[in-house]
Regions:
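Outer-membrane pore/translocation modules
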Residues: 117-234, 283
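Outer-membrane beta-barrel biogenesis signature
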Residues: 21-75, 175-177
């Protein structure tokens, strides 16, 4: 029973962990359907010599409210400049195509091509002027995101827990935030970024422990951003984006051979960034916590539909993210 459950869930949860339903005795091995396919993390690997693909669509909504001083302070109670209240709503749509190839039964290669569309709406009101006028600014655009390459290896097969390690390399093919110029009004940008602007390397390890009919999973990763020289205004600077430490864990549960769901928690700590080797006094650690719920339905032996929702638990986290993925095995 445990083997059948593990074989039927593995393709639906590659991100957080896995369950797999596959008919024993099939001539061709099938890629597992995992709880991680619902949330997009490493999981059961592609069999040797086979290809697997998946298309994905994600919707992310994020909003922020802040009060800023445009000017400087002379004394704690004396402000020179304007006080502005701004409200920003950012919507991001991402279409992704991922291809995986099984080098061996224990090792797979992956490439991911994303297309990113962003719509940013910012409302600003200077409250010190006594004016009720609100300035609305809308910026939108899209393009190729940061292409990613990855390799994963499953270390053991005979006994649980199963351990999968990997390395993911993210390129800077997307439009960098530092390549976006100011518009004619000098208050808004002419376009939006579709990438981070930096290369990064992410080693990661995932633990999967089947407890029939459930699967427990946990993951640890570290994102190292490669320092680069960028143009900030009229000057050049060496920017070292803060690295990211990620922890995740949760549970996948098999309702029947075709349907499973997952619950998960994820925590990310983004370290302080540096410019020209020094850290600004205004820099701070960012803490991102999210709760995830996903459902995986295998409608055929070679394909399934995965729907997941994530809710932000901290101020720095995205408010909401919805992802739909359709894996397909050749």
């Amino acid at each position: 029973m445990l083997r059948k459950n593990l074989a039927a869930h593995a393709i639906g949860v590659l991100c957080f962990s896995s369950l797999v339903y596959g008919a024993e005795g099939d001539d061709l091995p099938q890629r597992a359907q995992t709880v991680s396919d619902v949330i997009d993390k490493p999981g059961v690997l592609t069999p040797k010599g086979q290809w697997s693909f998946d298309s994905s669509f994600s919707y992310t909504q994020n909003s922020s409210n802040k009060v800023s001083v445009v000017g400087y302070t002379v004394l704690p109670t004396l402000i020179i400049g304007r006080i502005e209240v701004s409200d920003a709503d950012r919507t991001t749509l991402t279409l992704g195509l991922t291809a995986r190839y099984g080098v061996t039964n224990a090792t797979e290669l992956e490439v991911r091509l994303p297309y990113v569309y962003r719509n940013d709406q910012v409302s600003t009101r200077p409250i010190q002027d006594g004016s009720s006028e609100v300035v609305n600014t809308t910026m939108d655009g899209g393009g190729l995101g940061d292409v990613e390459l990855a390799v994963r290896h499953q270390f053991n097969f005979d006994s649980a827990p199963y351990w999968i390690g990997g390395v993911r390399v993210k390129s800077n093919t997307g439009r960098s935030p530092y390549d976006v110029t100011l518009g004619d009004d000098s208050t808004s940008f002419s376009d939006v970024s579709t990438g981070s602007g930096f290369w990064s390397v992410e080693p990661n390890i995932t633990m999967i422990h089947p407890v029939d009919p459930a699967v427990l999973f946990a993951g640890l990763s570290y994102i190292y951003n490669v320092e680069d020289n960028v143009s900030i205004g009229d000057t050049d600077a060496d920017v070292d984006l803060g690295d990211t430490i990620s922890l995740s864990g949760g549970m996948g549960f098999a309702v029947n051979p075709d349907l499973s769901f997952s619950l998960g928690l994820s925590h990310k700590t983004i370290l302080k960034s540096k410019v020209n080797g020094s850290t600004s006094d205004e820099a701070k650690l960012l803490q991102l916590d999210t709760f995830s719920f996903g459902v995986n339905y295998a409608y055929s032996k070679r394909s399934s539909v995965n729907v997941s929702a994530q809710a932000g638990l901290t101020d720095d986290s995205p408010d909401f993210q919805l992802t739909v993925r359709v894996p397909f095995n050749l």
